[in-house]
């Protein structure tokens, strides 16, 4: 989705804030659901984002995950016997691999992406200025240039109103950079087709 979005923006030469994709909107929702299932806390009280590619190289900004406004790291410190035992890799996999699990089970995944697309359309139509993890053109944000990647952004009537830069840990930034390199390489390849 990210590379195709970049290719469309390049081909049409439209304003980048008008060309974006759902990318990890659904993956982020699946991640929040997985965290909710493991913690017993309603997913509406959880903020968590899958960043980068909608695919294998996506990563989770664990340092930005909050539950009821409190950082996940604080929950883990305060409740080591419960939150401290959360398997972050398994939770990230649940967000990334959720679609494959559904596909293997029923042969299609139209409802999840349909719901995510409806979320984006609703944010635009009703000018909600809602924060969603969508693929946007980065030009300086997160240290990236001329690459579409999924990050939190405010979505409203005019498309992308603002790209939100999370403060990533050095390890998270490395993973995000690697994901962006993957997409940039694939985008450059698409230009040769």
Residue spans of the language-model regions?
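Gly/Ser/Thr-rich loops at beta-strand to alpha-helix junctions
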Residues: 1-5, 23-28
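Short Gly/Thr/Asp-enriched flexible loops that form oxyanion-binding sites at enzyme active sites
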Residues: 4-12
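C-terminal substrate-binding/catalytic lobe of Rossmann-fold NAD(P)-dependent dehydrogenases
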Residues: 12-18, 27-193
């Amino acid at each position: 989705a990210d590379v195709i979005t970049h290719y469309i923006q390049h081909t049409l030469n439209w304003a980048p804030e008008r060309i974006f994709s759902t990318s990890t909107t659904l993956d982020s929702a699946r991640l929040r659901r997985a965290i909710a299932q493991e913690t017993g806390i309603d997913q509406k009280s959880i903020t968590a984002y899958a960043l980068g590619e909608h695919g294998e190289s996506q990563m989770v900004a664990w340092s930005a995950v909050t539950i009821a406004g409190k950082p996940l790291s604080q929950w883990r410190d305060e409740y080591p016997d419960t939150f401290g035992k959360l398997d972050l890799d398994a939770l990230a996999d649940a967000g990334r691999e959720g679609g494959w699990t559904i596909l293997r089970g029923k042969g299609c995944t139209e409802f999840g992406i349909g719901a995510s697309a409806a979320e984006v359309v609703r944010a635009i139509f009703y000018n909600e200025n809602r924060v969603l993890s969508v693929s946007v053109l980065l030009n300086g944000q997160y240290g990236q240039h001329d690459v579409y990647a999924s990050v939190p952004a405010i979505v409203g009537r005019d498309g992308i109103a603002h790209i939100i830069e999370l403060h990533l840990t050095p390890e998270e930034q490395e993973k995000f950079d690697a994901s962006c390199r993957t997409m940039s390489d694939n985008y450059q390849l698409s230009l040769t087709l």
